[in-house]
């Protein structure tokens, strides 16, 4: 394709539509979140012709509403998922090397308290294994701290039950910006991403195999067909709607964050601590606010009508 075409320039939208409907792509991706954007860049960088469609804004779903961390998988150690910790840590290191301007180390303070989920020995052992498996190096490696050192770093911690703690590294990002950066980079390799295009139904060849998607333009209500040799469903929570009964139903989960003013909760740095039910919770300063979360509960309502229970908010605040 002509690499001079900028598929993010809305003034040329009619040209984009004409281009993608006149082409048989190698890969068509449904979903413009971080997963779809990553697949788009990977496929395009390998020389494949790629189209990506998104029914709303790019990164409008989970990819703009996360905890803003590239999680290394520390919590998976207690489940003995060592291979997963190694994989997530290695991929995180690659992402940091490729995009250091947007994937940056974030020191996490891990308090150890009486009768808590963690003790000094298990914390030290877990973090050593974590650093090794996740390929953490240099100044980003963990450090065990005494009680006085912990309180010096974070005076808001309660003194009476505190035993000590540790500092380890996660990586923070701007999730929606990272998604957009991946999409923009994929354009450099010739990919054709376009948003406000909704996949309505699959199209089939005479032999009965899927060869494309009939789509609707949400800005004009016009219908169009996009043809492709391979179709990848990267629509996340909307997977069932795309497949329309062709596979087992997804069991969806919901996570929330409480966002408070830093004036009300003025912590010095990010915390990772026990909740009342022994789940681990993050508290992460971002500018003038602090994100507290996240929860993990079964989701049973319509995705366009999100409901947040007061009891779940109280759980995070406690």
Language model features with spans:
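Helical element adjacent to the flavin cofactor pocket in flavoenzyme catalytic cores
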Residues: 166-225, 229
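Glycine-rich FAD pyrophosphate-binding loop
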Residues: 45-64
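Extreme N-terminal leader/targeting segments of oxidoreductases
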Residues: 1-27, 42-46
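N-terminal Rossmann-fold NAD(P) dinucleotide-binding loop
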Residues: 36
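Active-site substrate-recognition segment that forms the wall
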Residues: 42, 53, 101-105, 225-229, ...
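Glycine-rich Rossmann-fold phosphate-binding loop(s) that bind the pyrophosphate
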Residues: 32-33, 55
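Dinucleotide-binding Rossmann-like beta1-alpha1 core, especially the glycine-rich loop
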Residues: 68-153
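Short linear elements at protein peripheries
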Residues: 30, 130-161, 165-181
